[in-house]
Amino acid sequence: MPCIQAQYGTPAPSPGPRDHLASDPLTPEFIKPTMDLASPEAAPAAPTALPSFSTFMDGYTGEFDTFLYQLPGTVQPCSSASSSASSTSSSSATSPASASFKFEDFQVYGCYPGPLSGPVDEALSSSGSDYYGSPCSAPSPSTPSFQPPQLSPWDGSFGHFSPSQTYEGLRAWTEQLPKASGPPQPPAFFSFSPPTGPSPSLAQSPLKLFPSQATHQLGEGESYSMPTAFPGLAPTSPHLEGSGILDTPVTSTKARSGAPGGSEGRCAVCGDNASCQHYGVRTCEGCKGFFKRTVQKNAKYICLANKDCPVDKRRRNRCQFCRFQKCLAVGMVKEVVRTDSLKGRRGRLPSKPKQPPDASPANLLTSLVRAHLDSGPSTAKLDYSKFQELVLPHFGKEDAGDVQQFYDLLSGSLEVIRKWAEKIPGFAELSPADQDLLLESAFLELFILRLAYRSKPGEGKLIFCSGLVLHRLQCARGFGDWIDSILAFSRSLHSLLVDVPAFACLSALVLITDRHGLQEPRRVEELQNRIASCLKEHVAAVAGEPQPASCLSRLLGKLPELRTLCTQGLQRIFYLKLEDLVPPPPIIDKIFMDTLPF
């Protein structure tokens, strides 16, 4: 029979004792099987044989030990070009009627100590040799009754478990080697497939197997990277019997993600099948429609029993009262049901109305105070350039200069008051016509109130909004008796000890009030109520519990006095118009004509 030459070297000359036993079967890194099937007619090794394993592993002889075991039987001759050789090899001379197998150690990652793989191993891998992820095997003696399976030199697989380290264990292991039909598989370390049956030979083996904790059953479409486990390699070792890991059935992913729990998918009212939630609760279509009709029609039901009737799939239509009460008890929301005004829209829970940023009393009060401070002159910037304390009184009529000064002070105050009003929260949202109407109607009142609050009646000083400071006598000819009424009001206002926040609210109430001819009186009223509430809360917080009502009433009692002083100011303007010394500015004339009470 012609020789099937080993891929990496020639067989050993004779199977000596060293060839049967490896120096250390637990140390090697790789086991690479090579086979040399020979017959009595086998020829010596061809000269084209590849270099032996020792050529590549020079210096690593201690790491790679070889051994032989003989398989009896007659091997049929091969029809090849080398069959004409008549000389026998050294291995066939030793055992002419048997076939020899040569195994080299191979590496097992994670099982036994040994050197890591080197560049030689990668070179051998590229040459087409197989790597097996099982632990290292042990040699087997030549046995007459051993019948090897018909395997190709490189198609055999050693399975997922290590063979026994005894001769008898290796024999039982090699008897059950299946014939691999596919191409060589890449290494897949520790990916053991589940065992399928017991094996008494493994139970007798001293090899200890410790199963992995990550047992897993595959579903459809999944496959292991290694061949199927051998039937004879079931883990019946005493070390596995007590673990319970392999005895416990592991459910697959599909089994775990099966049917939902018993309560899911059921109507919370009657227990019928329910596919989704309705009005906040998982209910069936029947209870959904019943609840919807009851809410839309505002139906009233009466229970003929004790208001505890059973509500289930069979008896849900017997008592409508108890059924509707159970709908409410499980959490169905009536506000979500669409009414006639919401047709075409999905019902939603009513949300809280969003308030503007300045809607809260604290924010509103802060805005009013800021607007007041920005519109008034600071104490450090008062203008005393025209102030004269000692002025001789003029008993005659006013001249043109005094009238012009009077008009200039009114016109300057109007522009400052307009800018102040624009900073009041909510005033800019009103229509332009309403803004002008409110501003022109309250101008004289605001002029008096702001002048009275800034002035110092005890010293006879009048501080105008522009920062100009004049003495009472300097304004007597232009303002007439009106200036004395303003100073009297100033003394009364100062006696109340009104602080800046309260005065800011009071000034806003003078502007934001009901006037004849408003286009949107409702919006003006809402803004007025917000400012009044803000003033009330501030006075209550400052004055204390016993006196908030009296303080607020005294403060609001100044508003009628302002109306009286406003009428007195209109009379003064009317008088100056009759004198016709200086024509009034157009804006003052318009205000006069629009605010006349007659």
UniProtKB/Swiss-Prot annotation:
Span list, region Required for binding NBRE-containing DNA: 268-354
Tissue spec. comment: Fetal muscle and adult liver, brain and thyroid.
PANTHER family (alphabetical): NUCLEAR HORMONE RECEPTOR, NUCLEAR RECEPTOR SUBFAMILY 4 GROUP A MEMBER 1
GO MF, one annotated term: DNA binding
Post-translational modification summary for this protein: Phosphorylated at Ser-351 by RPS6KA1 and RPS6KA3 in response to mitogenic or stress stimuli. Acetylated by p300/CBP, acetylation increases stability. Deacetylated by HDAC1.
Pfam family, one: Hormone_recep
Keyword set, alphabetical order: Acetylation, Cytoplasm, DNA-binding, Inflammatory response, Metal-binding, Mitochondrion, Nucleus, Phosphoprotein, Receptor, Transcription, Transcription regulation, Zinc, Zinc-finger
Taxonomic lineage of the native organism: Eukaryota, Metazoa, Chordata, Craniata, Vertebrata
Full protein name: Nuclear receptor subfamily 4immunitygroup A member 1
Organism of this sequence: Homo sapiens
Quaternary context: Binds the NGFI-B response element (NBRE) as a monomer. Binds the Nur response element (NurRE), consisting of two inverse NBRE-related octanucleotide repeats separated by 6 base-pairs, as a dimer. Interacts (via N-terminus) with NLRP3 (via LRR repeat domain); the interaction is direct, requires binding of NR4A1/Nur77 to NBRE-containing dsDNA and lipopolysaccharide, and leads to non-canonical NLRP3 inflammasome activation. Interacts with GADD45GIP1. Interacts with STK11. Interacts with IFI27.
Phosphoserine modification, residue list: 341, 351
